[in-house]
């Protein structure tokens, strides 16, 4: 049973949300009926509904407002997660199944911008959760340390282009820290959304960063997800970037079992990343299209692309440079998600050239 203090917090949180003019998906789908059906439930990791909704209650202007404290939460609190997933992921219904993992034929992708006129850099990332561990809010300090140990020893076995160094955040020297900041590799303690979700406990225990010698392959350990794997480089050679990520993920998967669900695909802390978990993006200069926002948005929505400012969410495009990525992560394969970005960017470049 859920204890009285937690129930009290849940009731207070529900009242606060209900009285607010929050536009979040949490507010939209957490009806009294759903709330009453779920408030007494717990996962085997001990998570309650409160662990899922507290960030959205605290930050009423969240877009989504819900996180999964562990892999089981998606099943135990399905009455709330399912409609939110359906709303966010273009009608991915309760009865739908995410397709099995498929990286596709890497060779069919190419360089988006061989002349280097438009694409500044290219990046593909995915998220993974380690089986047998809850997500951030429910991890103990001992588990954080144990996970970091597993991850660093696994990564030390990577070879060839992926070979590199693991830097624990605990006890990191000022020089190393500065170097990682200069490289834009260092992640900071979570923002207020993650803080409110209790995703930053025991910081910096168990957190670390790995990168290969060329600084083109990066692994974040215990930032928002257990693992974030990132492949990136300057220019528009998506094939090279994608190929490197696929190799890295496959190598690591041989040694670390990942949380996967038949219906939802790979499991992540935030439901927006479920499924393929893949975000393929470019920093791209589109000075002419920048002057015609409507046209830019029209092409973006046709190819399911998300357009952000230069420094990611909630920022401006500096000097006409946009961060553009695939929006869809669920109900399609990894290859399809990346190919959608590839086709959309190719189209944007074609239009930019014609203006």
Swiss-Prot record:
<protein>
    <recommendedName>
        <fullName>Arginine kinase</fullName>
        <ecNumber>2.7.3.3</ecNumber>
    </recommendedName>
</protein>
<dbReference type="InterPro" id="IPR022415">
    <property type="entry name" value="ATP-guanido_PTrfase_AS"/>
</dbReference>
<dbReference type="GO" id="GO:0005524">
    <property type="term" value="F:ATP binding"/>
</dbReference>
<dbReference type="InterPro" id="IPR014746">
    <property type="entry name" value="Gln_synth/guanido_kin_cat_dom"/>
</dbReference>
<feature type="binding site">
    <location>
        <begin position="308"/>
        <end position="313"/>
    </location>
    <ligand>
        <name>ATP</name>
    </ligand>
</feature>
<keyword id="KW-0020">Allergen</keyword>
<feature type="binding site">
    <location>
        <position position="224"/>
    </location>
    <ligand>
        <name>substrate</name>
    </ligand>
</feature>
<feature type="binding site">
    <location>
        <begin position="63"/>
        <end position="67"/>
    </location>
    <ligand>
        <name>substrate</name>
    </ligand>
</feature>
<dbReference type="Pfam" id="PF00217">
    <property type="entry name" value="ATP-gua_Ptrans"/>
</dbReference>
<dbReference type="Pfam" id="PF02807">
    <property type="entry name" value="ATP-gua_PtransN"/>
</dbReference>
<keyword id="KW-0418">Kinase</keyword>
<dbReference type="GO" id="GO:0004111">
    <property type="term" value="F:creatine kinase activity"/>
</dbReference>
<dbReference type="InterPro" id="IPR022414">
    <property type="entry name" value="ATP-guanido_PTrfase_cat"/>
</dbReference>
<feature type="binding site">
    <location>
        <position position="313"/>
    </location>
    <ligand>
        <name>substrate</name>
    </ligand>
</feature>
<feature type="binding site">
    <location>
        <begin position="121"/>
        <end position="125"/>
    </location>
    <ligand>
        <name>ATP</name>
    </ligand>
</feature>
<dbReference type="InterPro" id="IPR000749">
    <property type="entry name" value="ATP-guanido_PTrfase"/>
</dbReference>
<feature type="binding site">
    <location>
        <position position="270"/>
    </location>
    <ligand>
        <name>substrate</name>
    </ligand>
</feature>
<feature type="binding site">
    <location>
        <position position="184"/>
    </location>
    <ligand>
        <name>ATP</name>
    </ligand>
</feature>
<dbReference type="GO" id="GO:0004054">
    <property type="term" value="F:arginine kinase activity"/>
</dbReference>
<feature type="domain" description="Phosphagen kinase C-terminal">
    <location>
        <begin position="118"/>
        <end position="355"/>
    </location>
</feature>
<keyword id="KW-0067">ATP-binding</keyword>
<dbReference type="GO" id="GO:0005615">
    <property type="term" value="C:extracellular space"/>
</dbReference>
<feature type="binding site">
    <location>
        <begin position="279"/>
        <end position="283"/>
    </location>
    <ligand>
        <name>ATP</name>
    </ligand>
</feature>
<feature type="domain" description="Phosphagen kinase N-terminal">
    <location>
        <begin position="6"/>
        <end position="90"/>
    </location>
</feature>
<keyword id="KW-0808">Transferase</keyword>
<comment type="similarity">
    <text>Belongs to the ATP:guanido phosphotransferase family.</text>
</comment>
<dbReference type="GO" id="GO:0046314">
    <property type="term" value="P:phosphocreatine biosynthetic process"/>
</dbReference>
<feature type="binding site">
    <location>
        <position position="228"/>
    </location>
    <ligand>
        <name>ATP</name>
    </ligand>
</feature>
<dbReference type="InterPro" id="IPR022413">
    <property type="entry name" value="ATP-guanido_PTrfase_N"/>
</dbReference>
<dbReference type="InterPro" id="IPR036802">
    <property type="entry name" value="ATP-guanido_PTrfase_N_sf"/>
</dbReference>
<keyword id="KW-0547">Nucleotide-binding</keyword>
């Amino acid at each position: 049973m859920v204890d009285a203090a937690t129930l009290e917090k849940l009731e207070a949180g529900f009242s606060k949300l209900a009285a607010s003019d929050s536009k979040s998906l949490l507010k939209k789908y957490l009806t009294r009926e759903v709330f009453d059906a779920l408030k007494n439930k717990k996962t085997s990791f001990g998570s309650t509904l409160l662990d899922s909704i507290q960030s959205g209650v605290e930050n009423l202007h969240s877009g989504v407002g819900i996180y999964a404290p562990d892999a089981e939460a998606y099943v135990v609190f399905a009455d709330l997660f399912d409609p939110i997933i359906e709303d966010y992921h273009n009608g991915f219904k309760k009865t739908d199944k995410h397709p099995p993992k498929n990286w596709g034929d890497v060779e069919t992708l190419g360089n988006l911008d061989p002349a280097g006129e438009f694409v500044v850099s290219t990046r593909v990332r995915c998220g993974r959760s380690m089986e047998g561990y809850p997500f951030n809010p429910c991890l103990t300090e001992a588990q954080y340390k144990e996970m970091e140990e597993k991850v660093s020893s696994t990564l030390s076995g990577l070879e060839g282009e992926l070979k590199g160094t693991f830097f624990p955040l605990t006890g990191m020297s000022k020089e190393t820290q500065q170097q990682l900041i200069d490289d834009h590799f260092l992640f900071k303690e979570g923002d207020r959304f993650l803080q409110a979700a209790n995703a930053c406990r025991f910081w910096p225990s168990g957190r670390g960063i790995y990168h290969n010698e060329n600084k083109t392959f990066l692994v974040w350990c215990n930032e928002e997800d257990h693992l974030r794997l990132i492949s990136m480089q300057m220019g528009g050679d998506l094939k090279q970037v994608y190929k490197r990520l696929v190799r890295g993920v496959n190598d690591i998967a041989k040694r670390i079992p990942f949380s996967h669900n038949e219906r939802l695909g790979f499991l992540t802390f935030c439901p927006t990343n479920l499924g393929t978990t893949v975000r393929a993006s470019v920093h791209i200069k589109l000075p002419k299209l920048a002057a015609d926002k409507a046209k830019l948005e029209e092409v973006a929505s046709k190819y399911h692309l998300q357009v952000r400012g230069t420094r990611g969410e909630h920022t401006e495009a500096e000097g006409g440079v946009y961060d553009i990525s695939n929006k869809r992560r669920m109900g399609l394969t990894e290859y399809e998600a990346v190919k959608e970005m590839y086709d959309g960017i190719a189209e944007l470049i074609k239009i930019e050239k014609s203006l």
